[in-house]
Each structure stands twice: as structure tokens, then as C-alpha cells.
Amino acid sequence: MKMVYKIGVSLLLLVIFSQYSTAQYTVNGNAQQVSCNQYRLTQEATFLTGSVWNNNKINLSNSFDFKFDVFLGNNNSPGADGIAFVLQPISTSVGTAGSGLGYEGITPAVGITLDTYQNGGDNDPAYDHIAIQLNGVLNHTSVNNIAGPIQAINGNDNMEDGQWHALRIVWDAPTKTITAYVDGVQRVTAVKDFVTDILSGDPMVFWGFTGSTGGEFNLQQFKTALNPYFHFSPGQRRCVNEPITF
């Protein structure tokens, strides 16, 4: 009876994880799911775009604290173009080609951009930079640029270093403050009533990542946190089709 119980629980958890993984995200363009929690936005090729959206809207009336790992590639010079974490109410199929990090032109939207290429037309700095930019507008002199640009990594001009970097996005609903951290260090923050000023009073948004390459390119990826609803022993693997032990 004990063995039957273990098998039954294992099968139940596998079903839950399978449904959770396959139904949770929509993948567009060049983007592809690499593993249960890892997504590629662009390959190392020119003029690509990709986006990955969570299918479940979140309510900006509530606070959130999202943690990811991001990979911006190995190519520093040449290398391009970057990625964006985006909040938008439109759909799970939006995204643009070419320059603009796959985010340009999406409106209404809130984007935290990680830009690895200096585009003069957007008044980009020479270093890899992070900013908070609204409504798919990437020009840093625009009123839609509400924080940054500053170095994406504190004290380091280059984020295309072949390393995974921790990206944390915190939204504090009572104070209407959004903050981004890279590798545990606060980089940009802004106070803005997104629901009233940007989203026409509707607090429900999709969240996701976009990315693009242009004439230069990089492999660009992100990882989500694994399913937090169950607690596992250290080293326990939790991907779909991998065995669960107790």
C-alpha cells in the first residue's frame, strides 16, 4: 500500500508539472524552449526576434518579486542587440523584428531593457546598459525613458561575457515603485502609476521577455524560477519527464 501511494503521488505531481510547463508560456518568432525553465530568445544569427510570454495575466494592484537568470551572449564586439522584460495587456503574440529588442512599438507597455549595442538614434551610451522605458519607445531622451540608462552590471561595461546573470524585478504596488537588480545590486528604479498613466485603469497585464538581433548578434536566453509550490531536497531535479523521488 505504501508503494502504491508513492507511485500515485509521483504520477500526480508529474501530471501537474507537465500541465504547468506546457500551458504556462507562449513562444513566438525565433524563441524556443530549451529546457523546462530555460528559453532562448535569439540564436547567434542576424536580424532575428523572439518573445516568450506567460499566459496568465498578473494584477498590478498586487506587489510582485520576480527572479530570473539572463544570458546576453559571448560576443562583445561585435554583439547585439539585447533583451527586455515587458509588462503589457495586449496578447501573448506581440513582438517586433529587427532593432528595438523585440520591444519597440509595443504599446501600452512597461519595459526594463538590457541593451548591449550602441544605437546612435536612440542616444545609447557605449556600455551595455539597463533602463526603464515605456510604450516600446527606446530613445533615452524621450519622456518614455523614466530611469537610466546606466551600466547593466555595476562597475562593468560588458554584459556579453558568456555568463548567466541574476535579474530581479520588484514591483511594490502600494508605493507604485518598480526596481530592477542585476547580480544582487540595484540598478534602476522608478515611481509611476502604471495602471492609471499607461494602462487606462486596467491592472491586468501579461509579463514576458523579448529579444532581437540586427546586423550583429548574440545567443540570448533567460531562465525562470522553477515551480515554487512544492519543496524538494537539495539537488532534486524538477523538469518534466525527470523522475521525482521522495
What does each of the following model-derived ranges do?
Residues F230-F246:
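Proline- and Ser/Thr-rich low-complexity, intrinsically disordered segments
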Residues G8-L14, G98, V191, P243:
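Generic N-terminal initiation segments characterized by hydrophobic and/or small/turn-forming residues
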Residues A23-Y229:
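Polar, low-complexity loop segments and adjacent catalytic/binding residues used for recognizing
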Residues S18, V195, H231-S233:
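Compositionally biased, low-structure terminal segments
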Residues M1, Y20, V94, G208, ...:
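A detector of low-complexity, intrinsically disordered, Ser/Thr/Gly/Pro/Ala-rich segments
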Residues M1-Y25, C239:
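Bacterial Sec-dependent N-terminal signal peptides
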